[in-house]
């Protein structure tokens, strides 16, 4: 027998072990059935899963369970990502904190061993959290992005792209993190708006490329980065700026270093910003770099890779080749100074040289490294790049032609905007952790690319006596992630898995990585994976983009804000003190602690109650609206915990009232079926139609809402309450019909709800199997999914029952208001009845009497005054009347009327007294006087109605 109280934590672990042990998550290999595959975006091994992971994994699991139950061969590939830079930083910090050692002190070999140890621990934590969430992935094919098979696939792809001249090495401007000493992606750069300074500096004009003009002739340059002036190679003005047109083609002198540079024109210059004159420093500003490309300017690097002033400048042309147009070196006094210290000294020298005109406060967007917190430096470095323009065309066409569909469709615009302005992708990183690039050099720096050194020697015919050394850079994590759709399916070795499940059906992702992951997967997959006609195969047919889960105030979650929601806290619950300690511990800035504590105390004064996995999953489904940002709401979680309780209690009632073996699939053949039985079956099939349509259209929020509305309002609060009212007084045939209907609906609801709330549905379904004829599949997840049957949806029954339901609710509320037992018989009448409702009442009079505990139901044909009745209600097609009786006698009602009339008269007297006060009328605002007059009129009208009712009752 089902336990009295719903206790999700008691059953979740054992149920998941039951599923996994029996291999229910594996493809079922149903011959002749279509395949359905999802490859999970691999979580980073940097720490615990957060609510965003739980949200997306719930969505994916709903899709997998739904498609499994409709008979498809489902495969859900799972794995974790090595997350190069993120993992390296986490482990570095851990070692520094625990052992006070740097990576340099530890050594490369030992450090990598520590990361692999971290990986094993972190992966176990992550996969255990996934299991807690109930996700039905095939664990027998779990992957890691640095697994040997994946690494082989990555090397093979790199070699292929290099041999096709799509990968090349070149010196270009990149986002350089001086603390991490590596190039980072745009995704890892965060701009912070700050109030900084704008320095206005004199650049003297020169004549004949060498002679300084008198000090009256100069241009004023406004800059926010005076420390970069050692790298200036031009001054730019707008071609249509009348102030500076005459200087275009002239030359100017860079302060302190005395380099002579040209004055050029470029439409990029904003005439309204600063002075309209811009110093061009191509090696340390991305906009300046683009201007240098257009005007063939020299590019001068003045910073080292740790953000200090170099002792010897590095000069290059626009192709990245070394150049030596300018001879000036950085003055000795600036060598090896940190860039921000150099800034202060340069400003002091400019003041001493009387070259600094003014300093002005200015709003700036400063680029910071998301992981290191350091100011990012645009830096000219040698990196490896992938040419993406040839790949982008076919990827754009795949979406335009409908081979790949974005859901919601609005995200196609974001995809196109990036793809149509795409630039070559920097794929190298200066890290220790990651896929080491399959590149080798000889002593002459000749480049060789292959699967490994042995393969390279064979490929390029290099003898063993020639020394080769491997490139130290690793690949950008996004490179291996972009191959995940096919590499995780065993490509190029595991032919069966790849053959059966590629292309995958849908990828679930956030809008913030459309550029960095989705687009790149499409490009590389379609370039590398071809059909028998040589056409590119899409990696997935649909892209479902979820919103970003934010905190209760709509703010993005981050550890520094102390607002990250741990899904396990929602499942298991956590005390207020433990929650505060947990979130404070994870914050980066201790100055925020007091504010964070106050917020936590306000949001969770009693901590967080245990709600179980199903409540969390239901919340995730219900929150999945097609919006960009989604507010987390703890009250929704508690509401869906109550839903699970409701379903549990309803199931318990049904199971307690079953004594005969029934077979749900034959339910509709059992006669007689009562009106309410036929109504609930019809309502259920309407639910099936709406629910499946919602799932098929990726509207999990709608699916959750219609399921909730049916189970709570129609099945539990109405149908089951009806059954309770007559189950002990009906005939055996009626009882059998009702029991079968209860089982049919419960069994069907459990199967319908299973993709969203798998644990409670499996637990109840297993208990229900004691009373029904079993099939050979011992789990609900392999049962067939309910199908819409139009033959079971009778429109007349739905309309009739909705009308009767309304009458039932009115009478139930009436009983509750007057504290009358639901078993006490009362009488009702109807007047002003339409022909349709007249027919309905006559046809179902006995049924109405039975379910509402009525002594008599009559139809009044004469035009009697409603005032003669105790209560009257206007309903569709009639007026419902409840006559006086021994339960509510006329004398008692007259007494109540007199009390009400006296009460209203007192209110009228008070208002009339106030409105007759001339002093009040003279001083009070017009709208206040008007408000009192309106109140008086309402009271007078109400009193008139009550007096009319009293007189009518006295005359009768």
Curated annotation (Swiss-Prot):
One of its GO terms (biological process) is valyl-tRNA aminoacylation. Its EC number is 6.1.1.9. InterPro entries: aa-tRNA-synth_I_CS (IPR001412), aa-tRNA-synth_Ia (IPR002300), Anticodon_Ia_Val (IPR033705), M/V/L/I-tRNA-synth_anticd-bd (IPR013155), Rossmann-like_a/b/a_fold (IPR014729), tRNA-bd_arm (IPR010978), tRNAsynth_Ia_anticodon-bd (IPR009080), Val-tRNA_synth_C_sf (IPR037118). SUPFAM superfamilies: Anticodon-binding domain of a subclass of class I aminoacyl-tRNA synthetases (SSF47323), Nucleotidylyl transferase (SSF52374), tRNA-binding arm (SSF46589), ValRS/IleRS/LeuRS editing domain (SSF50677). Residues 889-920 form a coiled coil. GO terms for molecular function: aminoacyl-tRNA deacylase activity; ATP binding; valine-tRNA ligase activity. Catalyzes the attachment of valine to tRNA(Val). As ValRS can inadvertently accommodate and process structurally similar amino acids such as threonine, to avoid such errors, it has a 'posttransfer' editing activity that hydrolyzes mischarged Thr-tRNA(Val) in a tRNA-dependent manner. It is found in: Cytoplasm. Monomer. Its main location: cytoplasm. NCBIfam families: PRK05729.1, valS. CDD domains: Anticodon_Ia_Val, ValRS_core. A motif ('HIGH' region) lies at residues 43-53. The keyword Protein biosynthesis applies. This is Valine--tRNA ligase. Belongs to the class-I aminoacyl-tRNA synthetase family. ValS type 1 subfamily. A motif ('KMSKS' region) lies at residues 556-560. One of its GO terms (cellular component) is cytosol. It catalyses: tRNA(Val) + L-valine + ATP = L-valyl-tRNA(Val) + AMP + diphosphate. It comes from Buchnera aphidicola subsp. Baizongia pistaciae (strain Bp). The gene is valS. ValRS has two distinct active sites: one for aminoacylation and one for editing. The misactivated threonine is translocated from the active site to the editing site. It comes from the Bacteria. ATP binds at residue 559. Keywords: Aminoacyl-tRNA synthetase, ATP-binding, Coiled coil, Cytoplasm, Ligase, Nucleotide-binding, Protein biosynthesis.
């Amino acid at each position: 027998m089902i336990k009295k109280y719903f206790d999700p934590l008691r059953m979740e672990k054992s149920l998941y072990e039951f599923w996994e042990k029996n291999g229910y998550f594996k493809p079922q290999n149903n011959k002749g059935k279509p395949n359905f595959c999802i490859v999970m975006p691999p979580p980073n091994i940097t720490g615990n899963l957060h609510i965003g992971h739980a949200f997306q994994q719930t969505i994916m699991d709903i899709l997998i369970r739904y498609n499994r139950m409709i008979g498809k061969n489902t495969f859900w590939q799972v794995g974790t990502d090595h997350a190069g830079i993120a993992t390296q930083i986490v482990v570095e910090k851990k070692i520094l904190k625990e052992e006070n050692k740097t990576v340099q002190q530890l050594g490369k070999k030992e450090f990598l061993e520590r990361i692999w140890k971290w990986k094993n621990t972190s992966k176990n934590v992550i996969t255990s959290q996934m299991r807690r969430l109930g996700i039905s992935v095939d664990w027998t094919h779990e992957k890691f992005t640095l697994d040997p098979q994946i690494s082989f696939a990555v090397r093979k792809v790199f070699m292929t792209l290099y041999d096709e001249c799509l990968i090349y090495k070149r010196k270009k401007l990149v986002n350089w993190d001086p603390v991490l000493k590596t190039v980072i992606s745009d995704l890892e750069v965060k701009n912070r708006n700050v109030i900084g300074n704008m320095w206005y500096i004199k650049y003297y004009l020169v004549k004949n490329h060498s002679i300084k003009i008198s000090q009256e002739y100069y241009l004023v340059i406004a800059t926010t980065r005076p420390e970069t002036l050692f790298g200036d190679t031009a001054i730019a003005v707008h071609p249509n700026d009348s102030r500076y047109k005459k200087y275009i083609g002239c030359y100017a002198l860079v302060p302190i270093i005395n380099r002579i540079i040209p004055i050029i024109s470029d439409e990029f210059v904003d005439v309204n910003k600063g002075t309209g004159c811009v110093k061009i420093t191509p090696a340390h500003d991305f906009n300046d770099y683009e201007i240098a490309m257009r005007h063939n300017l020299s590019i001068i690097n003045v910073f080292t890779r740790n953000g200090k002033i170099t002792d010897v400048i590095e000069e290059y042309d626009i192709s990245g080749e070394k150049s030596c147009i300018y001879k000036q070196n950085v003055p000795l006094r600036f060598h090896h100074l940190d860039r921000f210290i150099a800034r202060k000294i340069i400003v002091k020298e400019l003041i001493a040289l009387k070259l600094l005109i003014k300093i002005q406060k200015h709003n700036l967007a400063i680029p910071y490294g998301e992981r290191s917190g350091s100011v990012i430096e645009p830096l000219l470095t040698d990196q490896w790049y992938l040419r993406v323009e040839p790949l982008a065309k076919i990827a754009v066409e795949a979406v335009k032609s409908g081979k790949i569909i974005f859901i919601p469709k609005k995200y196609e615009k974001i995809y196109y905007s990036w793809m149509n302005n795409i630039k070559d992708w920097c794929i190298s990183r200066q890290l220790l952790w990651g896929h080491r690039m399959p590149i080798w050099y000889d002593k002459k720096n000749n480049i060789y690319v292959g699967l490994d050194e042995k393969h390279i020697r064979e490929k390029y015919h290099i003898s063993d006596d020639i020394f080769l050394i491997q490139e130290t850079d690793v690949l950008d994590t996004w490179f291996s992630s972009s191959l995940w759709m096919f590499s995780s399916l065993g490509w190029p070795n595991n032919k069966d898995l790849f053959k059966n499940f590629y292309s995958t059906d849908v990828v679930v992702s956030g809008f913030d990585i459309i550029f960095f992951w989705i687009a790149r997967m499409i490009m590389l997959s379609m370039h590398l994976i071809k059909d028998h006609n040589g056409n590119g195969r899409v990696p997935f047919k649909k892209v479902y983009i979820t919103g970003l889960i934010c905190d209760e105030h709509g703010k993005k979650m981050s550890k520094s804000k102390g607002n990250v929601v741990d899904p396990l806290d929602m499942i298991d619950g956590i005390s207020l003190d433990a929650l505060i300690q947990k979130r404070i511990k994870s914050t980066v800035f201790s100055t925020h602690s007091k504010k964070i504590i106050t917020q936590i105390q306000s949001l969770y004064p009693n901590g967080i109650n245990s709600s179980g996995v199903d409540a969390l999953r239901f919340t995730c489904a219900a929150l999945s609206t097609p919006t960009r940002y989604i507010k987390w709401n703890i009250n929704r979680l508690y509401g869906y915990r109550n839903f699970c309780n409701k379903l549990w209690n309803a199931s318990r009632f049904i199971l307690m009232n079953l004594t005969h073996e029934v077979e749900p699939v034959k339910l509709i053949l059992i006669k007689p079926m009562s009106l309410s039985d036929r109504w609930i079956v019809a309502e259920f099939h309407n639910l099936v139609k709406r629910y499946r349509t919602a799932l098929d259209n990726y509207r999990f929020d709608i699916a959750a809402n219609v399921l909730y509305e049916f189970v709570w309002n129609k099945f539990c609060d109405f149908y089951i309450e009806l059954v309770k009212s007559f189950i002990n007084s009906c005939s055996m045939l009626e009882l059998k019909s009702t029991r079968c209907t209860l089982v049919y609906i419960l069994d069907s609801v459990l199967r319908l709800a299973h993709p969203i709330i798998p644990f409670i549905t499996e637990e109840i379904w297993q208990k229900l199997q004691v009373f029904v004829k079993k099939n050979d599949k011992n789990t609900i997840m392999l049962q067939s999914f309910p199908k819409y049957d139009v033959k079971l949806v009778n429109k007349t029954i739905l309309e009739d029952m909705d009308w009767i339901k309304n009458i039932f609710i009115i009478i139930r509320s009436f009983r509750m208001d007057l504290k009358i037992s639901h078993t006490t018989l009362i009488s009702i009448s109807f007047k002003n009845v339409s022909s349709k409702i007249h027919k309905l009442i006559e046809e179902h009079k006995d049924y109405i009497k039975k379910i509402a505990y009525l002594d008599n139901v009559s139809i009044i044909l004469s035009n009697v005054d409603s005032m003669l009745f105790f209560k009257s209600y206007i309903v569709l097609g009639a007026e419902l009347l409840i006559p006086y009786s021994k339960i509510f006698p006329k004398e008692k009602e007259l007494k109540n009327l007199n009390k009400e009339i006296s009460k209203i008269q007192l209110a009228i007297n008070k208002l009339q007294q106030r409105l007759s006060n001339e002093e009040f009328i003279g001083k009070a605002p017009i709208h206040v006087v008007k408000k009192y007059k309106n109140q008086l009129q309402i009271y007078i009208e109400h009193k008139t109605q009550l007096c009319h009712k009293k007189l009518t009752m006295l005359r009768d």
